[in-house]
Swiss-Prot record:
Transmembrane segments: 75-95, 118-138
Activity regulation details: Inhibited by organophosphorus esters.
Organism: Aspergillus oryzae (strain ATCC 42149 / RIB 40)
Main location: endoplasmic reticulum
Binding site for a nucleoside 3',5'-cyclic phosphate 1: 692-811
S-S pairs: none
Name of a matching Pfam family: cNMP_binding
Protein name, UniProt field: Lysophospholipase nte1
Motif GXSXG: positions: 1266-1270
Residues at which a nucleoside 3',5'-cyclic phosphate 2 binds: 856-976
Active site residues according to the UniProt entry: S1268 (nucleophile), D1386 (proton acceptor)
Renumbered residue ranges of the record's region Disordered: 242-264, 302-393, 529-559, 1517-1538
Entry EC no(s): 3.1.1.5
Stretches assigned to the Lumenal side: 96-117
Length: 1538
């Protein structure tokens, strides 16, 4: 084998050697035969040579097999072979491919020659295909980006959830129900301290009445309430044999239902007044007042003897039998002697059973073991010359319909309460007087039209208050006083004089004195008196009526007083006489304080007649209000007698009061006092210092002397306006005051005078003299200008005159009522003025003033008002409680005293539609009561609400005796029905018809409370609340605005304000504030779980959720708490922006998860810190301190640099009334200014000029609505609230629309429309981009016509370009736009000027700009048939006298706009609508090329129209507020420099 195959063997060896690296260890099974190798050796050799070459050129060599780890040398060999064999092979392959293989391929490719031969047609087709492909890509992939925006459908209006009514009437059985009914009945007394509550209820008794049993309430001597059962109250239809009704009344009653007319004993006819159910009182408010005031004298002229006897026995025996008492003495009566002899036992027996009372009604007060009724006691009541007063319940009978349980608090409990707790009594009387005004007087005057009965009380009150000046203050002294005003009158102009000239008061600055300091002095003096075992009131009467020389008490006075008391009675009586300027007329009242220390430094030649006038006026006022020296002397004597005769009882009371009150955490605090020092006082100290007012420390008279102002008013000046709070008391020195009412107010405002009187300056805490010129200042600021212009010229009706010596404003000032009349200076008049705050201090320290007023009111009350007061029920309902359900029987009319109600209609499909909301002073339910139909809707309370329930039985009774009441209520119903006809509600029944929304006109009118709630912690709600309050002040809210936070509440009510018992006091305090101010802001500045946050939610008519726009839109913790409260109040979202810009889509992120936002949203620009400092500072480390310091420095630098780097905002308010907070304030007040823009094609360019004219005139625009081109222009302005970007974008869009090439390129086969709509879409999309309506700075909407569902739709959310495009879609020219399966077209087909919808959103004044075309109304007479050929010839015949008949397209267009014409005429006659139509008739619908010309036409017309309104005085400018401030009362009167 070796010899034969030498060459083959050599080649095989070489092959083996070359393959050896690849196969280091060949398999032993691989065997080859010699023959096979010999036959294929050349082929194999050639193949292997090629393979080796190719592998060397393309494939890198494989890696070396790993060496055997037997020795270290193997490892080194493997690494050596890898570096020196594999790597060079790879480099060789890369270099070979780059330098040889790749160039060879390229050379071969480029050396080839290809030849294509095509004709022109082929080239043209190819070019056309390329162009078509590119145009398709640009058209459908680039230019129609608007069609690929993410789906953002309109936001659905939230549905209202009526939470289940858990406050059903008889839900609690047993004792709990009994207690609840009793507590609900005594709520009329307001907040009761624990000892006061025990004092009232410890003698309470219960009585069972069987069905059919009658009770004569005119003989009942106590407070009666129904605990369980049903009682009907009847009144006699005749009195003293004289019918009070016409002859037909009995026949009317006989024909009516059995419940309206009853006969008792077959003699007298009775009429049903009301039905009293569980938890209601059988006593009226006047009867409660009579229980407190039966021992009070009516006038100061009755003398000290009679007055002394009137109170003495009451305090002696603690039981008086004079209900309703004669104010004359009973000292010699056997009963008085009996009570003196028996002491405490008689008091307890009489208090517990009340059997010593005269004229005991035939009531069996249950089982008792008291002494039998003694007949001789009532007989001495009839003394000669003394007439017994009639009952306050004349001719009133109660009858039990079922077995009934009643509770009776006897009159003795009220008398004892008056004596032991005089300040608490005064507080209760104040509450009852307030509710008397809110319930009875307001209902009778404003609702029933009983002006004569209500105003007659004030007229008759003058006989009690008239007090003449001393003789020495008349004649020459009065002439000298008048001479002091002459120079000032000559110096000032008529406009300044009519405001009033006040005499200079040098000591006016000393009026304000810390009430807390006076309280501490009073408590200290009371403790000193208690330690010395002497009564506080041992001084002489001159000590009370006298006046110390100093301007106010001081600590030095306390020391001097104590020293005088130590010297003995002689000096004790001498000091007041020496220190009283009334006893020594030559005393200069305003000496220096150093002279006051000695009573002997007086100069007779330093007589100050001004001070004497002030003191004389003060004496007359104090006598007029019942605060006389004899009264106080009597109270002082009564307190001595009580202490001397029954010292055991006095000590028991003092111990009991002190023990109970010390343990009681809720000290008595006056609701109008901001000091919390009263919590440290005891009941005894208050009773001793306030009953007689005898503390020489708290010498109120010294303070009041400096509060008296002497003011001159020329003839015609208005001192008090109807509907406002009395600024104080006016004492007429010389001249006459005319008291009257505007004639038109009787018919204009039938519902309580609570309708806002805008433009009045806010009421200050100390409202000094405020003057007006005429009654024209009653005009509202931006309410309907036409109605207010008419009101200016209406006359007034004079009621009576106030002569010299008379007092005006007594009832209103002491009881904090609003004035029912105007008070005008009949002649030049000189008056003394005492502010209302001074009267409040008098009432606080001397409860006798309130009790005297209550006594006088009960004595002057007409019988009609008494019956109305008896039948009216004061009802308190909780938030969410349903008052009546849909379909219930209508049994009463409800008048809202405080709170807010909502009426909702429950549909068959479960949807809830808001019918209306009712605020303070409004009524609901008259139509159902008069028609005796069922309730058409469900009425529930949005928050805690006080109502006056006017039962149908009372209405029927009054209708028979007083038909004028029926006429008055009929006028009210007729006015409401007319409003429903003239201002229809927005269309219902669709997805976009605001079903369930509370965003209606009724929901923004008469808002009284607004809660400001943050979304999450860190939102600056306090600063936001203050800015909003300032804006509300500037726009002029009636009666002013106040804001409350937790600190303010704690300052007023103490730290226990939010406790279980303190909530009663808190609710009453908040109700008083809401009645006092026009709007109250509740700022939730505490943590989320605090009671104050809960109070802010429950007390709010509207809740503003304030969030930072740049922060996370997730649900905050305050919102979760709000949802847990289940409140039904209107909720609005307020987004705070650092800059006046809202990124597209931001608002949708906030609203997406907040379906409970049912009142809209607002964008507000307000500077704030995005990273507020933490409220709870953490432990400060060195690194944290440095980091915090750096952050502070960085924030300070950014404050001065970052805002300058940014571009200036697009809009800056030129007037302060165009700010965001003013816009929100007008929205809350229902005084928003709306702008409605109509459609008309290119004629709508004139609207740009009108808007510019409005902005230059300073008129703010709050809501914008538009149709067709009006929707486009309105959206441009609402987006930035500035005319500059609006003008630029509108002109750019007009340029695109003026290009005919764009429309020619957009033409298509006219199956649906002539164009595809793409160019139109592009023009609108290039203007608005992807912005959404929610992101607009101003509230905006546009309307469209849904031809799929044949209804109009209003869009206020979603992409702007889509709904603006839909609102501008003319049928036939542009295809309808599809929205959720519906086809939308131009909104002008149904309503081209959407004034009605704008009015429904709450806009008060609406500027409506109409640019539509005018239809050709030429009469046609072509006959009954018409030839088309004749029509064509007639059009071309210039001599034809026949008008051209309309074409087919014209007929279709007119047919499409039929309903729009009717809505346009209705819009022109809408109250508050200012209709504007620029002269744009010569311009066509598509003449967008004349932009500048049409713009100038609109601008010139707008300026001319607004100037015309300004000259007529009907322009609703905010600047008018400044002018009205000149006409109305100034903040402080101009003082004469005399």
């Amino acid at each position: 084998m070796a010899t034969d195959g030498g060459p083959l063997a050599a080649s095989s060896a070489s092959l083996d050697s070359s393959l050896s690296p690849l196969h280091a260890s060949p398999s032993p099974s691989s065997t080859y035969t010699a023959s096979s190798l010999a036959l294929s050796a050349p082929a194999i050799a050639a193949s292997f040579s090629v393979a080796s070459t190719f592998s060397n050129s393309l494939i890198p060599p494989p890696p070396l097999p790993p060496p055997t780890p037997s020795t270290m040398a193997g490892w080194f060999g493997w690494v050596f072979s890898f570096f020196f064999q594999v790597i060079p092979s790879v480099l060789y392959w890369v270099i070979t491919f780059a330098t040889i293989t790749l160039p060879t391929w390229l050379f071969t490719l480029f050396s080839m020659s290809l030849t294509f031969t095509m004709n022109f047609t082929t080239l043209l087709l190819i070019a056309l295909a390329i162009v078509s492909t590119i145009s398709w890509f640009i058209r459908y992939r680039f230019l129609n980006m608007y069609s690929r925006l993410p789906s953002e459908p309109q936001r659905k209006e939230p549905h209202l959830d009526l939470f289940p009514d858990v406050q059903e009437g008889d839900s609690k059985p047993g004792l709990a129900n009994y207690l609840d009914e009793f507590l609900s009945a005594i709520k009329v007394f307001g907040y009761l301290e624990r000892p006061v509550f025990h004092e009232l209820t410890r003698t309470m008794q219960t009585r069972k009445l069987i069905a059919g049993e009658t009770l004569m309430l005119e003989e009942e001597k106590g407070f009666c309430l129904v605990v369980d059962g049903l009682v009907q109250i009847f009144v006699k239809s005749m009195r003293d044999g004289k019918p009070n009704v016409d002859e037909g009344s009995n026949h009317m009653g006989a024909e009516s239902s059995d419940e309206d007319d009853h006969r008792v004993d077959g003699k007298q006819g009775y009429q049903l007044l009301t039905e009293v159910k569980n938890g209601a009182s059988m006593s009226s408010l006047f009867s409660i007042l009579s229980l407190f005031t039966e021992d009070i004298q009516l006038r100061a002229s009755e003398g000290s003897s009679s007055s002394a006897s009137s109170v003495g026995p009451s305090t002696n025996a603690r039981v008086s039998d004079s209900f309703p008492a004669s104010p004359h003495g009973l000292e010699d009566s056997p009963r008085s002697n009996f009570v003196r002899d028996h002491g405490d036992s008689v008091a307890h027996i009489s208090n517990s059973n009340g059997e010593l009372l005269p004229s005991v009604p035939p009531l069996n007060l249950g089982e008792s073991h008291a002494m039998p009724i003694q007949e001789p006691y009532p007989k001495p009541r009839s003394q000669p010359g003394k007439r017994r007063r009639k009952s306050v319940h004349p001719d009133i009978v109660a009858r039990a319909m079922v077995d009934t349980t009643i509770a009776i608090i006897p009159a003795s409990a009220f008398r004892r309460l008056t004596r032991v707790y005089p300040r608490a009594t005064a507080h209760i009387v104040q509450v009852i007087l307030t509710r008397l005004q809110r319930v009875t007087f307001a209902t009778a005057h404003s609702y029933l039209g009983l002006n004569n009965d209500v105003l007659g009380i004030e007229k008759q009150m003058t006989k009690f208050t008239t007090q003449d000046l001393p003789n020495e203050m008349r004649g020459a002294a009065l002439d000298r006083l008048k001479d002091k005003f002459i120079k000032e009158r000559d110096r000032l102009g008529p406009e300044e004089i009519i405001k009033g000239i006040a005499l200079h008061n040098p000591f006016a600055g000393r009026r304000r004195r810390s009430s807390s300091f006076l309280r501490k002095e009073a408590v200290l003096h009371a403790k000193m008196a208690a330690q010395s075992k002497r009564p506080v009131s041992m001084a002489s009467p001159e000590d009370i009526s006298g006046d110390r020389e100093s301007a106010g008490p001081s600590p030095g006075d306390l020391l001097s007083t104590i020293q005088l008391s130590r010297f003995g009675p002689r000096y004790e009586h001498l000091a007041p006489k020496l220190l009283s300027p009334l006893t020594d007329k030559e005393n200069p009242p305003f000496m220096a304080p150093v002279m006051h220390s000695s009573p002997f430094h007086r100069k007779k030649d330093a007589v100050d007649e001004d001070a004497l006038f002030r003191e004389s006026i003060l004496d007359c006022i104090m006598n007029g209000i019942g605060l006389t020296s004899s009264t106080r002397d009597v109270l002082r004597k009564s307190s001595h007698t009580s202490g001397d005769i029954s010292p055991k009882l006095l000590s028991y009371d003092s111990r009991r009061q002190k023990a109970v009150f010390t343990n009681n955490a809720f000290g008595f605090i006056d609701p109008y006092d901001s000091s919390a020092d009263g919590e440290t006082e005891s009941m005894m100290s208050m009773s001793m210092t306030s009953a007689g007012g005898t503390s020489p420390i708290v010498n109120l008279r010294e303070e009041l002397r400096n509060d008296i102002e002497i003011v001159y008013f020329p003839q015609g000046s208005v001192l008090v306006e109807q509907g406002e709070r009395h600024p104080g008391l006016y004492y007429v020195i010389d001249g006459f005051l005319d008291v009257g009412i505007p004639v038109s107010d009787k018919g204009e405002d039938l519902v309580g005078g609570s309708r806002p009187v805008y433009g009045q300056p806010p009421e200050e805490f100390f409202p000094t003299l405020k003057r007006t010129t005429t009654s024209s200042s009653r005009v509202s600021g931006v309410t309907s200008a036409t109605n207010d212009t008419k009101r200016k010229r209406q006359s007034r009706k004079s009621l009576y005159l106030i002569k010299p010596g008379g007092i005006q404003g007594y009832v209103g000032s002491v009881a904090s009522y609003r004035s029912y009349t105007d008070v005008v200076a009949k002649t030049d008049v000189y008056v003394g003025f005492l502010p209302r705050s001074s009267l409040e201090r008098i009432a606080e320290r001397y409860p006798i003033a309130l009790l005297t007023l209550a006594k006088r009111l009960t004595s002057l009350l007409p019988r009609l008002l008494l019956h109305i007061d008896f039948a009216l029920e004061w009802v308190q309902v909780s938030a969410g409680q349903v008052i009546y359900h849909q379909g219930d029987e209508s049994d009463a009319i409800y008048l809202v005293l405080n709170g807010r109600l909502r009426s909702v209609l429950e549909g068959t499909d479960g949807k809830i539609t808001v019918v209306g909301e009712y605020g303070q002073g409004e009524s609901v339910g008259e139509l159902e009561v008069m028609t005796e139909s069922t309730r058409p809707a469900t009425l529930h309370a949005i928050r805690d609400t006080e109502l006056a329930k006017f039962p149908r039985s009372l209405f029927n009774s009054l209708a028979q005796e007083h038909p004028g009441i029926t006429i008055q209520v009929s006028k009210l119903i007729a006015q409401r029905m007319r409003d429903l006809v003239e201002l229809p509600m927005p269309e219902k029944g669709g997805e976009h018809a605001n079903v369930g929304s509370v965003k209606t006109a009724a929901s923004v009118v008469n808002l009284r409370t607004v809660g400001i709630l943050p979304v999450t912690a860190g939102v600056p709600v306090v600063e936001f609340g203050h800015r909003l309050q300032n804006a509300l002040h500037q726009i002029g809210v009636t009666n002013g605005v106040t804001s409350l936070n937790q600190a303010a509440i704690l300052n007023h009510l103490g730290r226990h304000a939010f406790s279980k018992m303190g909530k009663l006091k808190l609710s009453q305090y908040l109700a008083d504030l809401e009645e006092k101010y026009g709007m109250v802001l509740y700022i939730a500045d505490t943590n989320v779980n605090s009671p104050w946050t809960q109070t802010c939610i429950t007390q709010a008519d509207c809740i503003l959720l304030v969030g930072l726009a740049e922060s996370s839109p997730s649900i905050g913790e305050y919102e979760r708490f709000l949802l847990g409260m289940k409140t039904t109040a209107r909720k609005e979202l307020v987004l705070l922006h650092s800059e006046r810009y809202c990124p597209p889509g931001l608002t949708r992120q906030w609203l997406k998860n907040r379906m409970w936002i049912n009142g809209g949203h607002h964008h507000i620009q307000m500077g704030f810190r995005l990273t507020p400092e933490p409220s709870h500072p953490q432990a400060k480390r060195l690194g944290a301190v440095l980091k915090q310091r750096v952050q502070v420095i960085q924030a300070e630098i950014q404050k001065y640099t970052s805002r300058r780097i940014r571009q200036t905002p697009l809009y800056s308010a030129q007037t302060p009334f165009k700010g965001d907070f003013h816009r929100l304030a007008r929205r809350l007040c229902g005084r928003s200014v709306g702008l409605v823009l109509g459609g008309g094609g290119a004629r709508g360019i004139a609207q740009v000029g009108v808007i510019k004219a409005l902005e230059e005139a300073g008129i703010p625009i709050d809501i914008i609505g538009g149709t067709s081109i009006g929707s486009f222009i309105g959206a441009l302005y609402a987006r930035d609230a500035d005319v500059v970007p609006m003008y630029g974008r509108a002109k750019k869009f007009a340029g695109r629309m003026a290009s005919m090439w764009r429309f020619m390129l957009d033409l298509t086969y006219p199956t649906t429309s002539y164009t595809t709509g793409h160019e139109f879409n592009r023009g609108i999309f290039k203007t608005f981009g992807d912005s959404q309506i929610e992101d607009f700075w101003l509230e905006y909407y546009c309307n469209t016509t849904n031809i799929s569902k044949s209804r109009p739709e209003f869009h206020s959310s979603g992409y702007t370009w889509r709904y603006v495009r839909a609102s501008m879609s003319l049928a036939g020219l542009i295809p309808p736009i599809c929205d959720e399966g519906s086809m939308l077209l131009d909104g002008g087909y149904i309503d081209n000027l959407t004034v009605t919808h704008m009015k429904g959103l709450g806009a008060d004044v609406i500027f409506a700009v109409d640019v539509g075309s005018i239809d050709d109304n030429t009469p046609q007479g072509y006959g009954d048939s018409l030839s088309g050929f004749w029509t064509v010839l007639n059009r071309w015949n210039p001599f034809s006298a026949c008008p051209n008949p309309p074409t087919l397209s014209e007929i279709q267009a007119r047919l499409a706009y039929v309903s729009s014409i009717d809505n346009l005429e209705r819009a022109k006659n809408t109250p508050g609508c200012l209709y504007m139509r620029p002269p744009i008739d010569p311009y066509g619908t598509l003449e967008f090329g004349k932009f500048d010309e049409i713009y100038q036409v609109g601008y010139a017309y707008g300026k001319q129209y607004l100037e015309k309104l300004r000259s007529e005085g009907s322009l609703p400018l905010p600047e008018e507020t400044e002018e009205k401030k000149k006409l109305q009362r100034t903040l402080a009167p101009r003082r004469a420099s005399i």
